[in-house]
């Protein structure tokens, strides 16, 4: 959730603008503009849909629409402005063979992720298994922890610390783990247990699993995704 906020400085020079409705004088923080963005966005929510757990969060700073579809499917359409993350999966998460497919189209290769995303508690950890991403590679601003050969590809492992940032437990300081696929793809099968074990071997301790979803995340970009989680709920 809100993972991009830790890399705003690095991203701002890269982030493109694709606003459908420009803010007066380019100011995106005015009250009328903020209200307009919120009216055009799907409100944050969590719950169950067709047996799957879903999580949807947006900071309300961009027009973004999230829709749950049949089975394990969902879609997201977004435009420039803020941060969002959402998708379908399981509560609790854990070691699972996840098969997914779909489309992931950030406009102009903008800042966005297609990933397996989740949290653990005790310790509090936010983790990403990145399958595809736009122009920004989050590993560039995190500490390297080695590589993993898995799911027919190579993943680089990384770790960073988030200080006093939003989490599933409120504002906390916690670790953020990454596994970033070098051969980007929009479909495939991921055995999450392989990644959890690789992180543990690298000294990156996992906790008790909270939710885990096949997620789309975006920050100051535009695009669309249509994802189908094929692994049963």
Swiss-Prot record:
EC number, UniProt record: 3.2.1.8
Q: What happens when the gene is disrupted?
A: Retains 88 percent of the catalytic activity. Double xyl1/xyl2 deletion mutant retains 19 percent of the activity and exhibits a 50 percent reduction in accumulation of total mycelial mass.
Residues the record marks as carrying a glycan: 27
Q: Which residues form the signal peptide?
A: 1-20
InterPro entries for this protein: ConA-like_dom_sf, GH11/12, GH11_AS_1, GH11_AS_2, GH11_dom, Glyco_hydro_11
Q: Which residues form the active site?
A: 126 (nucleophile), 217 (proton donor)
Where found, per UniProt? Secreted
Which pathway, metabolic or otherwise, does it act in? Glycan degradation; xylan degradation
What UniProt keywords are attached to this protein's entry? Answer: Carbohydrate metabolism, Glycoprotein, Glycosidase, Hydrolase, Polysaccharide degradation, Secreted, Signal, Xylan degradation
Q: Where is the GH11 domain?
A: 40-230
Which reaction does this enzyme catalyse, per its entry? Endohydrolysis of (1->4)-beta-D-xylosidic linkages in xylans
A Gene Ontology cellular component where this protein is annotated is: extracellular region
Inducing factors: Expressed in presence of rice cell walls or on oat spelt xylan, but not when grown on sucrose.
Biological-process GO terms, alphabetical: xylan catabolic process
Q: Which GO terms describe its molecular function?
A: endo-1,4-beta-xylanase activity
The reply on keyword Ligase is no
Q: Do you know which PANTHER family this protein is assigned to?
A: ENDO-1,4-BETA-XYLANASE A-RELATED
| Described function | Endo-1,4-beta-xylanase involved in the hydrolysis of xylan, a major structural heterogeneous polysaccharide found in plant biomass representing the second most abundant polysaccharide in the biosphere, after cellulose. Accounts for approximately 70 percent of the endoxylanase activity in the culture filtrate.
Which family, according to the similarity comment? Belongs to the glycosyl hydrolase 11 (cellulase G) family.
What protein am I looking at?
Answer: Endo-1,4-beta-xylanase 1
Organism for this UniProt entry = Pyricularia grisea
Gene coding for it: XYL1
């Amino acid at each position: 959730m809100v993972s991009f906020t830790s890399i705003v400085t690095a991203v701002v020079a890269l982030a493109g603008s694709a606003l459908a409705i420009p803010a007066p004088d380019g100011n995106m923080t005015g009250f009328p503009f903020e209200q307009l963005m919120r009216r055009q966005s799907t409100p944050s929510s969590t719950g169950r849909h067709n047996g799957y757990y879903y999580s949807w969060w947006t900071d309300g700073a961009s027009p973004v629409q999230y829709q749950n579809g049949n089975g394990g499917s969902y879609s997201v359409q977004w435009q420039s402005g803020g941060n969002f993350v959402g998708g379908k999966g399981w509560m609790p998460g854990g070691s699972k063979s996840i098969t997914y497919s779909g489309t992931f189209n950030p406009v102009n290769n903008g800042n966005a992720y297609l990933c397996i995303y989740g949290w653990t508690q005790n310790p509090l950890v936010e983790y990403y298994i990145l399958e595809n991403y736009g122009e920004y590679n989050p590993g560039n601003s995190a500490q390297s922890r080695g590589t993993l050969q898995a799911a027919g590809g190579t993943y680089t492992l990384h770790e960073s610390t988030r200080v006093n940032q939003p989490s599933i437990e409120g504002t906390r300081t916690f670790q953020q783990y990454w596994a970033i696929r070098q051969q980007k793809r929009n479909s495939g099968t991921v055995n999450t247990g392989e990644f959890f074990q690789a992180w543990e071997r690298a000294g990156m301790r996992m906790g008790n699993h909270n939710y885990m979803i096949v997620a789309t995340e975006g920050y100051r970009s535009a695009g669309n995704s249509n994802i189908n989680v094929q692994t049963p709920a």
